[in-house]
Amino acid sequence: MGRVSSLALALLLPAVQAQQTLWGQCGGIGWTGPTNCVAGAACSTQNPYYAQCLPGTATTSTTLTTTTRVTTTTTSTTSKSSSTGSTTTTKSTGTTTTSGSSTTITSAPSGNPFSGYQLYANPYYSSEVHTLAMPSLASSLLPAASAAAKVPSFTWLDTAAKVPTMGTYLADIKAKNAAGANPPIAAQFVVYDLPDRDCAALASNGEYSIANGGVANYKKYIDAIRAQLLNYPDVHTILVIEPDSLANLVTNLNVAKCANAQSAYLECVNYALIQLNLPNVAMYIDAGHAGWLGWPANIGPAAQLFAGVYKDAGAPAALRGLATNVANYNAFSISTCPSYTSGDANCDENRYINAIAPLLKDQGWDAHFIVDTGRNGVQPTKQNAWGDWCNVIGTGFGVRPTTNTGNSLVDAFVWVKPGGESDGTSDSSSARYDAHCGYSDALQPAPEAGTWFQAYFEQLLKNANPAF
């Protein structure tokens, strides 16, 4: 859908019109506020719902959409949950079809898929840090910001239009490996485009609707990802599969949208696991986090669901295990359980993993795990409640990606959530506003999910543990 450019709007509107501050919203569906930016900033469209005043002129702001990102549709990288007592109500943070069994694998790759590889630093995230964050940072923070931009993080494929970006990155990795990268580089992507996505919340609604051919569209999306992976069979690729999706089926079937999506979610995830079961791939299904599925009432049903999904897909050899704490804040290991975890003995990710792993093994799946440590550097957190997921105040970057986890069940600590991208808007008039983003423990004002949140990035940088 065509949109009038910010420059054209500036020519059409009176010069006396109110101007939006740097990093403020300046456009989007339903927006009635200022559409001009203060001097030194330009209004840049991030997605149909949100345009933001970014540093620079209208010309330089186009660096936001370089060849490393195919579309400006919102990147929603949020995994959410809210807990009460011993139970949890979750609220999530050219297609080529290729088929055939000749490229699937029938025996599992041996060992930890992270061992012997270095991880790819997400070029789009690096561009966000250098073009959006650093121009307005204090000089004392610039070295730390530059270092953060180099930390490998996952690229989120949250719309079908972004799948070709895989080809750009995989080609770059292939070239670097051919040039002698030592150890060789591995790619990291998040598969995140289910129909009726984010079924228990509003902040990260996706592009597909079950009622409007969403399942068929999702399968085309997976086929396109498979085609990219087949084009680069010599690039080792690690995938996180559908944050929040299966966890919502454990705790949120009382929500009509989730109940209606249950069969579609299972069908789509099953299709993804089968089609992406390739020799150069290692997959981890998202498994929420300790404050979501670690509760006594939830952990058994969660293990049953995950093991069932594993078996229903034919025990894919490329399916290594589960990803936890995606886009969340939990400690991996904490000596004293925080007060907001009261009632859940599994008060950190280490305890959660150690509790669910034997339940999975009892049902035939010897699963391993990865843990997102991108925003868990401050412990305990400043959450008023464990389920407060949106742009939580006081957080910091956590441990950098490593295979040195101290737990043989845990393959690696990783950065799945790109730190500095918003979890959701605090603007209550927005179509995608979720009340969690207006809570007192959420940093405000906040832009739409997936768009750059300068104040949050600075918070993560200042509170990084270990420091940069």
Curated annotation (Swiss-Prot):
GO MF annotations, alphabetized: cellulose 1,4-beta-cellobiosidase activity; cellulose binding
Entry annotation: catalytic residues: 198, 244 (proton donor), 423 (nucleophile)
Region entry Catalytic, spans: 107-468
Region annotated Disordered, chain positions: 68-107
Compartments in which it is found: Secreted
UniProt family annotation: Belongs to the glycosyl hydrolase 6 (cellulase B) family.
Function: The biological conversion of cellulose to glucose generally requires three types of hydrolytic enzymes: (1) Endoglucanases which cut internal beta-1,4-glucosidic bonds; (2) Exocellobiohydrolases that cut the disaccharide cellobiose from the non-reducing end of the cellulose polymer chain; (3) Beta-1,4-glucosidases which hydrolyze the cellobiose and other short cello-oligosaccharides to glucose.
Record EC number: 3.2.1.91
Underlying gene: cbhC
PROSITE patterns xref list: CBM1_1, CBM1_2, GLYCOSYL_HYDROL_F6_1, GLYCOSYL_HYDROL_F6_2
GO CC terms: extracellular region
Domain comment (free text): Has a modular structure: a carbohydrate-binding module (CBM) at the N-terminus, a linker rich in threonines, and a C-terminal exocellobiohydrolase catalytic module. The genes for catalytic modules and CBMs seem to have evolved separately and have been linked by gene fusion.
Signal peptide annotation: 1-18
Main location: secreted
Protein name as annotated: Probable 1,4-beta-D-glucan cellobiohydrolase C
Span of domain CBM1: 19-54
Cysteines engaged in disulfide bonds, as pairs: 26-43, 37-53, 199-258, 390-437
Reactions it catalyzes: Hydrolysis of (1->4)-beta-D-glucosidic linkages in cellulose and cellotetraose, releasing cellobiose from the non-reducing ends of the chains
Lineage: Eukaryota, Fungi, Dikarya, Ascomycota, Pezizomycotina
Pfam families assigned: CBM_1, Glyco_hydro_6
